[in-house]
């Protein structure tokens, strides 16, 4: 809801107030404790996957290189929001500077965009490995996989420059309270002193094209993969392929299910509380679940993690490669 015209000439805002989760002090402390534990577990889970891939030579393959990149991304994805949210639980003001808000906006959504590209790259890797096994070693070399990973990072951090720039140029001169725990484009545009239909349309088109194009690419890849797997005569071969692809599909379902509800469905018009819960799910809970999904459904990753935990015990430290 735009502010009245008579307030349009007020001083521009220098900071925003993130309402977060308004509740009693006791509940705030409880939430702080819960999210602090979730954050630490997320860091530990994704770091374990990175270390397992790094220290096991037999995991230096395109699939696991992409997975290690994905885990590294998840660490920074959750770090872009949770530490600030934890600080706000213990703060009385819950303020964030104007520039700090847009920096968080840029990094959070850039990493979310990068995640869609990595999920697409991982789906393409599985398609080549299962549907084109004879061509896979020549097409998906380690060097090419590294270039694909670098492309995901560069494209992910380039795509959101335009939306961030357009929204940052809107005049903010009235209310500065954001009913959210992060700087989300929807609540930000609602605080603008003037209507900005062009910016809203551009952002909506951008979100829809990005989400649906990558989602269709991923689903098309896995549709072909499933068709190929069903033709495998060996039950053991089918089980191994489904175990690997099943973990990828579970991650895709968690992430895309929540962002579609958030950005390409009527949920955007629902109360702020629902938007917070959905955002919380894809920004905090999915990075926590992903290491569990990959480690529980992938035999090679389970073995690598077991080996990692074994050598980390006191008195048994040695190089994992030995």
What do the PLM-derived regions correspond to, one by one?
Residues 1-322:
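Transmembrane helical core of 7TM receptor-like proteins
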């Amino acid at each position: 809801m735009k502010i009245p015209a008579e307030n349009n000439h007020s001083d521009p805002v220098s900071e925003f107030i993130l309402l977060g989760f308004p509740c009693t002090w006791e509940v705030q402390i409880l939430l702080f404790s819960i999210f602090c534990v979730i954050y630490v577990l997320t860091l530990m889970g994704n770091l374990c996957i990175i270390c397992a891939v790094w220290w096991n030579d037999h995991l230096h393959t395109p699939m696991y290189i992409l997975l290690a990149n994905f885990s590294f991304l998840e660490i920074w994805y959750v770090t872009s929001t949770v530490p600030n949210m934890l600080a706000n639980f213990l703060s009385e003001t819950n303020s964030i500077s104007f520039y700090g808000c847009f920096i968080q906006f840029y990094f959070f959504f850039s990493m979310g965009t990068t995640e869609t590209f990595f999920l697409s790259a991982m789906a393409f890797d599985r398609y080549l490995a299962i549907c084109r096994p004879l061509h896979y070693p020549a097409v998906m070399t380690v060097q090419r996989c590294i270039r694909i990973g670098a492309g995901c990072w560069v494209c992910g951090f380039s795509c959101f420059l335009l939306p961030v720039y357009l929204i940052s140029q809107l005049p903010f001169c009235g209310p500065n309270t954001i009913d959210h725990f992060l700087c989300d484009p929807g609540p930000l545009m609602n605080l603008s002193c003037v209507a900005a239909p062009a910016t809203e349309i551009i952002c909506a088109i951008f979100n829809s094209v990005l989400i649906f194009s990558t989602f269709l690419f991923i689903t098309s890849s896995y549709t072909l993969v499933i068709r190929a797997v069903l033709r495998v005569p060996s039950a053991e071969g089918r089980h191994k392929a489904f175990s690997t692809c099943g973990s990828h599909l579970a991650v895709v379902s968690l992430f895309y299910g929540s962002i579609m509800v958030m950005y390409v469905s009527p949920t955007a018009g629902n109360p702020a509380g629902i938007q917070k819960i959905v955002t919380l799910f894809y920004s905090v809970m999915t990075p926590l679940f992903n290491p569990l999904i990959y480690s529980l459904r992938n035999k090679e990753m389970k073995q690598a993690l077991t080996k990692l935990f074994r050598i980390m015990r006191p008195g048994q430290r040695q190089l994992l490669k030995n």
